[in-house]
Regions:
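Extracellular/virion structural assembly segments
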Residues: 55-125, 129, 137, 151-165
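Solvent-exposed edge beta-strands and adjacent loop segments
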Residues: 2-79, 123-143
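Extracellular jelly-roll beta-sandwich "head" domains, especially the C-terminal globular C1q domain
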Residues: 144-151
Length: 165
C-alpha cells in the first residue's frame, strides 16, 4: 500500500510570467516573487441548487454547480524593498502585456509546491500596492491583490527566470 507523505509550505514558490503568444500559457521564464507568506484558498466548494422533487420523503436533493473564485485573490507579504520592487515590476509587465498591439498577452501566476508534481496556474491582473496598516514594535505586512481573469488549473512545474535568490 502506498504511503502518503504530507507536504509543507517549505520551498513554496509563487511566480509569474507574461504570455509571449496570446492564449498560450508560458512554461519557462517565471519570475519568483519574494516575501510572500500566504496564498488564497483555491479549494472552493461548488455552489448548489435545490433539485428536490415530490419523490423526496425526508431530505432535499442538491446538484453541484460552479465553484466561486473571489473577486480579488489575497496574497500576504512581508513588506520589504525587494518585494515592493518585484511587485511594481509585475504590475508594469502586466500593463505592457495587456496593451500589446498583437493582442492582449495575459499574465500567468504559478504556485509551485515543493514535493508536488504539478503546480497551480491562473491568469490575473495584479493590483498596485496600497498603504498597509502598521503597529508599533512589529514587522510590516501587506496584502497584495490579484484579480483573477481565468480558472485555476494544475499543470507541470515551470522553469524560472530567477533562481529564487
Amino acid at each position: 500500500m502506498a504511503k502518503n507523505i504530507p507536504l509543507s509550505t517549505i520551498g513554496v514558490k509563487i511566480s509569474y510570467a507574461v504570455e509571449t503568444v496570446a492564449g498560450t500559457r508560458p512554461t519557462t521564464g517565471y519570475n519568483i516573487i519574494h516575501g510572500l507568506y500566504s496564498t488564497p484558498d483555491f479549494n472552493a466548494a461548488p455552489n448548489t441548487a435545490d433539485a428536490t422533487s415530490f419523490d423526496n420523503k425526508e431530505y432535499t436533493t442538491k446538484i453541484a454547480l460552479l465553484k466561486e473564485i473571489p473577486d480579488n485573490l489575497e496574497f500576504g507579504a512581508r513588506m520589504g524593498q525587494t518585494f515592493v520592487n518585484e511587485w511594481e515590476t509585475l504590475v508594469s509587465a502586466y500593463e505592457t502585456g495587456i496593451k500589446t498591439s498583437s493582442g492582449a498577452l495575459e499574465t500567468w501566476f504559478c504556485i509551485d509546491i515543493e514535493g508536488l508534481d504539478k503546480s497551480i496556474y491562473f491568469t490575473g491582473k495584479p493590483i498596485a500596492l496600497g498603504i498597509p496598516s502598521m503597529e508599533a514594535n512589529s514587522g510590516i505586512d501587506i496584502t497584495a491583490y490579484i484579480s483573477p481573469t481565468g480558472e485555476p488549473i494544475f499543470s507541470t512545474d515551470p522553469t524560472y527566470a530567477n533562481d529564487g535568490e
